[in-house]
């Protein structure tokens, strides 16, 4: 659609059709090239890279929140005149994607990964990637994100793959990558090693079994306790604390293992806590990380009794071939039958599970590749401690520093096929390892062609760690890298602070010598209305596209940000999306009204003398205040507060007050202030659309295109046009200047005057509602001013009060001792308001009605108070249920007080 078509006509459709507008305008933005990021020498760029969605599937509400938050910042900064890059892309998500494809093959009855072979299986995963990449990019477009698609990246693109190899080789040459045989977390289902942070710990109810181990010489026995009886088949010692007086005399003696019959020694090690359990700890070096370290210190044997699939090995003797859990059951049964089971206790403990598939992990000794973390962590710690990198909210700084200060070496090898294959080649002739950025054909040491590449792939986070600079061309010295790096802000979920954020920081400092971004903004998770995590098992997941199809993109975006605050989870409520949709409709209808009343209007020439009244001056002042607040709040990453500020300005001040206040002037062609009202409406609406645009881009663009008034484009607009390969840039609100307070619009006096007028109207409306006086019933009112200044203001606003207060006879006078009789009263700053009720209500009937309502309210409150005084309810009910009950009780108490006050007033009138 051309710019001319967009500008045609000034009339909006009777109703807002979100789907029609969204489909047309995203294509319009793409055709216009508005979001191509220009390189403008001398201009400070603003860059944010997308946290790349995994190609495992489709986007969820968390992605919608994340990309909305980023897009708000990007649109804001673009409108401030910065050359702005929002860089999109996707992540190959090695293990997670491989799992999904294997599941897909299994469900379809296809061959297994191993039946296919590596090359054919990887081809299947590429097909999967293409399919879901297309879905993800389509979803991002639906969300209206203003990314530069010409710079889109994928973590396994040729360019990014080269960066990954360069990273590996550089760290290897510096001695920061090594191959070691250590105990690692192993997933029996996915058949791969995992890093520490890929293990999630779940609190589970289990058992603690106590077994008797007899001394080999028959002189007695000791008791050990374990939660994993199956591992005892790999015991090679029992350890006690060297200072534990109970067992000092036994150190060095031999035990006869009750399950295997082998003799094992009693050893002394300071690791053992004498106060825990019996003070005796069985040592199984192959299957426990702490036992592994003890085994190394004492030179113990390390038999493997559990295999990589979770099955018992030949070393498990008669239990060989059993599943680990079946083995547990058999051992406990044998112990009970043979008399060496002492007791069984209920025991709650943390169980490590694979973060990808949920399988209970198995600690196993294996040879893996590791990154030496201490030298990399130190500069990453300094960058945050010194304030070079700021984490928002600040409380996560301590979390980051604690993890980095206690960081363990990073296991980076994975026994999978999808991903970046480790760039190491083994020579079968001389045993040398060739580590290279390019595929070698011969061993670099002996020249043999008999070399083979390491079978494993790198942890997916190894490539993601390079995302802020590999996407811009690193390791090459590109124009994009020089101009757009370091990036500015990273917006992401707090749940990947360690997985991703920390790794980007130390990788960037190591490879580029620069921080990757100056600010990290962390947001929470999107939960369901009950506060539960969304999951397939609960069936409470929400597809953002379903929400968009029903309510529109702008409504979803606005709901997500108004419910958010940095670092905190948000709850998804359909009602709140409906409220956001209603807000969009309110804006559309108000804009339609404004446009219909601008048909005969021409913008005033600069310096023209228009007769602005107090309402005009007030709304301009309120606009300035809103613009100032929103800019400050966005600068502090307070998206929710910024959005709510705009909402309040548009809904309440502009629509509910200003438009209603100016209607009589608009409807009267002879009114000398009509032109000023039109000028104010046009300019405030145009500025308001620009203020709201980063939050609700579609509806603001659609309305703005119809305005007979345009703000100038930002300075970088011509450069954006050139970046898009165009001679000129067609108009779009997204490349106009973001509002700041307008010079000459500040008017504290008008603000103060209108505050009294509005408070007076609100008081009249409140009395009308309180006494159920019909909306169309004209009510007489006496307004007593408490000062000469207030009297002047109220007289100036008489027409406003009469019109919006729907008064009959309105008396405005100085405050007097004699008050109107039989009148409802209200007090505001600067005035007392009285509404005589004679003839408006049947006093006895109203007293009877309110008395009944007071009794009912009191009974309901008593029930809730009884519930809240019940300890059983307070301790057993869910916290959210208790909180809701408290809120209901507080509301009823407030209602009771209001009813009592109203009854007292009516009874005093009754005499």
Curated annotation (Swiss-Prot):
Keyword hit for GTP-binding: no
GO cellular component: cytosol
Protein EC: 6.1.1.9
Motif ('KMSKS' region) on chain: 533-537
Keyword Nucleotide-binding: yes
Catalytic activity: tRNA(Val) + L-valine + ATP = L-valyl-tRNA(Val) + AMP + diphosphate
One Gene Ontology molecular-function label: valine-tRNA ligase activity
InterPro entries in the cross-refs: aa-tRNA-synth_I_CS, aa-tRNA-synth_Ia, Anticodon_Ia_Val, M/V/L/I-tRNA-synth_anticd-bd, Rossmann-like_a/b/a_fold, tRNA-bd_arm, tRNAsynth_Ia_anticodon-bd, Val-tRNA_synth_C_sf
GO biological process: valyl-tRNA aminoacylation
Keywords: Aminoacyl-tRNA synthetase, ATP-binding, Coiled coil, Cytoplasm, Ligase, Nucleotide-binding, Protein biosynthesis
Short motif ('HIGH' region): ranges: 53-63
Annotated compartments: Cytoplasm
Coiled coil: 845-910
Annotated positions binding ATP: 536
Domain topic, free-text comment: ValRS has two distinct active sites: one for aminoacylation and one for editing. The misactivated threonine is translocated from the active site to the editing site. The C-terminal coiled-coil domain is crucial for aminoacylation activity.
Subunit structure, interactors included: Monomer.
Function per UniProt: Catalyzes the attachment of valine to tRNA(Val). As ValRS can inadvertently accommodate and process structurally similar amino acids such as threonine, to avoid such errors, it has a 'posttransfer' editing activity that hydrolyzes mischarged Thr-tRNA(Val) in a tRNA-dependent manner.
Protein family: Belongs to the class-I aminoacyl-tRNA synthetase family. ValS type 1 subfamily.
Name by which UniProt lists this protein: Valine--tRNA ligase
Species this chain originates from: Symbiobacterium thermophilum (strain DSM 24528 / JCM 14929 / IAM 14863 / T)
């Amino acid at each position: 659609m051309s710019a001319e078509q967009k500008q045609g006509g000034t009339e909006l459709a009777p109703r807002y059709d979100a789907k029609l507008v969204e489909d047309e305008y995203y294509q319009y933005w793409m055709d216009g090239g508005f979001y191509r990021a220009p390189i403008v020498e001398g201009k400070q760029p603003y860059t944010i890279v997308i946290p790349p969605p995994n190609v495992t599937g489709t986007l969820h509400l968390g992605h919608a929140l994340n990309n909305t938050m980023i897009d708000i910042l990007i649109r804001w900064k673009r409108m401030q005149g910065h050359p702005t890059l929002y860089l999109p892309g996707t992540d190959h998500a090695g293990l997670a994607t491989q799992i999904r494809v294997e599941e897909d093959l299994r469900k379809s009855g296809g061959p297994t990964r191993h039946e296919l072979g590596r090359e054919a299986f990887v081809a299947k995963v590429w097909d999967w990637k293409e399919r879901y990449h297309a879905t993800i990019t389509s979803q991002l477009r639906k969300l209206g994100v203003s990314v530069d698609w010409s710079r889109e990246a994928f973590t396994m693109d040729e360019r990014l793959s080269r960066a990954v190899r360069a990273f590996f080789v550089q760290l290897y040459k510096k001695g920061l990558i090594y191959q070691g045989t250590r105990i690692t977390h192993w997933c029996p289902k996915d058949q791969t090693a995992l890093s520490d942070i890929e293990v999630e710990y779940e609190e589970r109810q289990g058992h603690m079994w106590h077994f008797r181990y007899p001394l080999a010489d028959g002189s007695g026995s000791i008791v050990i306790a374990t939660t994993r009886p199956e591992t005892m088949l790999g015991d090679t010692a029992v350890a006690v604390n060297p200072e534990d007086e109970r067992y000092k005399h036994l150190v060095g003696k031999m035990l006869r293992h009750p399950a295997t019959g082998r003799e094992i020694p009693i050893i002394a090690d300071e690791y053992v806590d004498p106060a825990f359990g019996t003070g005796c700890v069985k040592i199984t070096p192959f299957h426990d990380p702490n036992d592994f370290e003890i085994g190394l210190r004492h030179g113990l044997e390390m038999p493997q009794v559990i295999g990589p699939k979770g099955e018992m090995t030949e070393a498990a003797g008669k239990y060989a071939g059993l599943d680990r859990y079946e083995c547990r059951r058999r051992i406990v049964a044998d112990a009970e039958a043979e008399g060496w089971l002492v007791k069984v206790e209920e025991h709650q403990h943390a169980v490590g599970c694979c973060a990808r598939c949920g399988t209970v992990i198995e600690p196993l000794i294996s040879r893996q590749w590791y990154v030496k973390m201490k030298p990399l962590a130190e500069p990453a710690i300094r960058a945050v401690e010194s304030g070079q990198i700021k984490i928002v909210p600040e409380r996560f700084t301590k979390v980051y520093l604690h993890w980095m200060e206690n960081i363990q070496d990073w296991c980076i090898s994975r026994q999978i096929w999808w991903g970046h294959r480790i760039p190491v080649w083994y020579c079968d002739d001389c045993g040398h390892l060739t580590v290279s950025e390019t595929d070698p054909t011969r061993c670099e040491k002996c020249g043999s062609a008999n070399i083979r590449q390491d079978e494993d792939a790198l942890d997916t986070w190894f490539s993601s760690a390079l995302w802020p600079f590999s996407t811009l061309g690193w390791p090459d010295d590109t124009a994009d890298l020089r101009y757009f790096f370091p990036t500015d802000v990273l917006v992401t979920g707090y749940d990947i602070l360690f997985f991703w954020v920390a790794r980007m920081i130390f990788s960037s400092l190591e490879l580029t010598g620069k921080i990757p971004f100056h600010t990290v903004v962390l947001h929470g998770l999107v939960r369901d209305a009950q506060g539960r995590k969304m999951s397939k098992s609960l069936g409470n997941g929400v597809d953002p596209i379903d929400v968009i199809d029903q309510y529109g993109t702008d409504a979803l975006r606005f709901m997500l940000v108004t419910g958010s605050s940095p670092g905190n989870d948000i709850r998804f409520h359909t009602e709140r999306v409906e409220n956001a949709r209603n807000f969009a409709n309110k804006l559309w209808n108000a804009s339609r009204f404004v446009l219909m009343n601008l048909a005969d209007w021409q913008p005033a020439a600069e310096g023209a003398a228009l007769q602005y009244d107090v309402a005009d001056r007030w709304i301009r002042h309120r606009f300035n205040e809103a613009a100032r607040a929103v800019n400050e709040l966005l600068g502090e990453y307070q998206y929710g507060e910024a959005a709510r500020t705009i909402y309040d300005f548009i809904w309440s001040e502009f629509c509910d007050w200003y438009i209603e206040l100016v209607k009589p002037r608009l409807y009267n062609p002879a009114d000398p202030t009509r032109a000023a009202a039109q000028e104010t409406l046009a300019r405030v609406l145009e500025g308001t659309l620009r203020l709201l645009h980063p939050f609700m881009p579609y509806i603001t663009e659609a309305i703005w295109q119809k305005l007979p008034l345009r703000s100038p484009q930002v300075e970088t607009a011509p450069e954006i046009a050139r970046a898009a390969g165009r001679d000129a840039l067609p108009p779009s609100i997204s490349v106009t200047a973001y509002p700041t307070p307008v010079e000459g619009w500040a008017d504290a006096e008008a603000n103060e005057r209108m505050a009294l007028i509005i408070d007076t109207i609100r008081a009249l409306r409140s009395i009308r509602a309180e006494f159920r006086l019909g909306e169309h019933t004209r009510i007489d009112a006496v307004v007593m001013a408490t000062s000469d200044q207030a009297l002047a203001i109220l007289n100036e606003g008489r027409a406003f009060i009469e019109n919006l207060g729907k008064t009959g006879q309105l008396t405005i006078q100085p405050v007097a001792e004699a008050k109107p009789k039989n009148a409802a009263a209200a007090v505001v700053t600067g005035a007392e308001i009285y509404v005589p009720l004679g003839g408006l209500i049947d006093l006895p009937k109203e007293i009877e009605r309110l008395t009944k309502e007071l009794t009912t309210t009191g009974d309901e409150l008593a029930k809730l108070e009884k519930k809240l005084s019940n300890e059983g309810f307070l301790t057993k009910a869910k916290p959210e249920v208790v909180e809701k009950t408290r809120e209901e009780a507080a509301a009823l108490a407030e209602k009771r007080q209001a009813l009592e006050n109203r009854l007292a007033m009516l009874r005093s009138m009754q005499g």
